Amino acid sequence: MREQLDQIRREAAEALCAVDTMEALQDWRVRILGKKGVLTGILRGLGALPAEERPLMGALVNEVRAELEFKLEEKSRELKAREKEARLSGESIDITLPGRVQPVGGKHPLTLVIDEIKQIFLGMGYEIAEGPEVELDYYNFEALNLPQDHPARDMQDSFYITSDILLRTHTSPVQIRAMERIRPQLPVKVICPGRVFRRDDDATHSPMFHQVEGLVVDKGITFGDLRGTLLTFARQMFGPDREIRLRPSFFPFTEPSAEVDISCVICGGGGCRVCKGSGWLEILGSGMVHPRVLEYGGYNPQEVTGFAFGMGVERIAMLKYGIDDMRLLYENDMRFLAQF
């Protein structure tokens, strides 16, 4: 059996040298090392040997198997390298061809509008202030001159977590925090972008939406400063021909207060279906900061005045891009979002 094993080793090695394809190498492996291969047959025949010879012959068979498996791996690497070299030598690459342009994503329309609003007010010397979305009742209501019995404090309209902690219903609390941080220095000149939460859900309202509010506090601030600021914003956001109109209104944290309209972005003020024939579209609320709010912020209303304004980003985006249903902004439909 030893002579037979030596012959198998020699013939298998010679046959392996003649192999020149991966298919032929696989055939060689099955014939020599496979379950029905030559070496397996030798192992099965060990039972016919005397008991004292079996361990020695078994060790010799395993030695031959290990040697042939090593040569098999070497041959496999050699053939793979040869095939790769042949494939590369047969291919040609035209380096003058243009590269493949990878598709790139785009910003969400709300992000585009928020970024544009930020740039407009940064250009006017404002800084960006931020605050927590989970807010204390004190900052969300009390410090903004909203009394305990105000409808906005109804738990049916706001998302309360505990009796004195809720999801903020506007970004106005950031104005109080900004005044507390900056006092007693002047001026205070900030915008406060962020998410807010209310119990609304229809074509023009969402339980979560975005606001940008602004605050200016300094000596000698007038309503004229407010109007000039908002006119500048409207013309930079909607075009140089836009006009604004201020209508008397009421907000607990400003006095006097005004709703702000712009001349219709569709008809230019002539009257159309979008503006319902009025020529005007409402965009935000504003007013002079209430003296009590100044006091809560740590300023003396006898020495300083200020103005504030607040806008819904979704409203601005709908007007700017002609979107008629707010819910489109949150449905993640790529056919819609890819337009921006």
Swiss-Prot record:
Major subcellular location class = cytoplasm
Tell me which residues bind Mg(2+): E255
**Matching Gene3D superfamilies:** Bira Bifunctional Protein, Domain 2
List the molecular function annotations (GO) for this entry: ATP binding; catalytic activity, acting on a protein; magnesium ion binding; phenylalanine-tRNA ligase activity; transferase activity; tRNA binding
**What is a single cellular component term in the Gene Ontology annotation?**
cytoplasm
The record's subcellular locations are:
Cytoplasm
Swiss-Prot/TrEMBL GO biological process terms? phenylalanyl-tRNA aminoacylation
One matching Pfam family: Phe_tRNA-synt_N
Against InterPro entries, the record matches this protein to: aa-tRNA-synth_II (IPR006195), aa-tRNA-synth_II/BPL/LPL (IPR045864), Phe-tRNA-synth_IIc_asu (IPR004529), Phe-tRNA_ligase_II_N (IPR004188), Phe_tRNA_ligase_alpha1_bac (IPR022911), Phenylalanyl-tRNA_Synthase (IPR002319), tRNA-bd_arm (IPR010978)
Q: How is the cofactor bound?
A: Binds 2 magnesium ions per tetramer.
EC top class, as a word:
ligase
Reactions accelerated catalytically: tRNA(Phe) + L-phenylalanine + ATP = L-phenylalanyl-tRNA(Phe) + AMP + diphosphate + H(+)
Its keywords, alphabetically, are:
Aminoacyl-tRNA synthetase, ATP-binding, Cytoplasm, Ligase, Magnesium, Metal-binding, Nucleotide-binding, Protein biosynthesis
Q: Which cofactor does it need?
A: Mg(2+)
Q: What is its EC number?
A: 6.1.1.20
Q: Which family does it belong to?
A: Belongs to the class-II aminoacyl-tRNA synthetase family. Phe-tRNA synthetase alpha subunit type 1 subfamily.
Q: How does it assemble?
A: Tetramer of two alpha and two beta subunits.
Q: Which NCBIfam families match?
A: pheS
Stated name of the protein: Phenylalanine--tRNA ligase alpha subunit
- Provenance organism: Heliobacterium modesticaldum (strain ATCC 51547 / Ice1)
Gene this protein is translated from: pheS
